[in-house]
Design a protein with these regions (language model features):
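Hydrophobic alpha-helical bundles in membrane proteins
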Residues: 1-155
Length: 155
């Protein structure tokens, strides 16, 4: 479980640092195949330190779980602290409107047609949707860890 978390943290970090353009949409524009990344690549490159911090926090959190071997109070504290820092950094990073590639939305319209108001709105707000999912997952992770740490510390 902890090893999978470490692997995921490393993969996330590498993908966003090395090839963030992999998350893209493909469409045909004027007879030419075009690939538009979801995120603004320049912003991603400028904020590489956020991505590195997310990776370090994830590896640190999972490493403590791996070293301790069970849900201890130390694991609980490390999880809460790293998730709070992770959440704060994620809010700062994802709420910047520069993160989204404006050309991506043109690709959505090209792909689905101009009458795709709902789809366009979802993608225009994607950074906020993505943020909500991440904050929700961090919250669930904290709650699960606290419950398990308290449960196993009584035994």
């Amino acid at each position: 479980d902890a090893i999978i978390g470490i692997v995921f943290s490393v993969i996330f970090t590498l993908v966003f640092l090395v090839c963030p353009q992999i998350v893209c949409i493909a469409f045909v524009k004027n007879g030419v195949s075009v690939y538009e990344p979801l995120f603004n690549l320049e912003y991603i490159r400028q904020t590489w330190y956020f991505i590195l911090a997310f990776g370090i926090l994830g590896v640190a959190r999972e490493s403590v779980r791996l070293i301790d071997g069970s849900y201890t109070k130390r694991v609980m504290l490390v999880t809460i602290i790293t998730n709070l820092i992770d959440g704060a950094l994620t809010i700062i990073w994802l709420l910047n409107d520069k993160i989204m590639n404006p050309n991506f939305f043109e690709g959505i319209e090209q792909l689905f047609g101009e009458n795709t108001e709902v789809i366009s709105q979802v993608f225009i707000q994607f950074n906020k949707v993505f943020l909500a999912i991440i904050i929700f997952a961090l919250g669930i992770n904290c709650i699960e860890t606290v419950i398990k740490a308290l449960k196993y510390s009584r035994k």
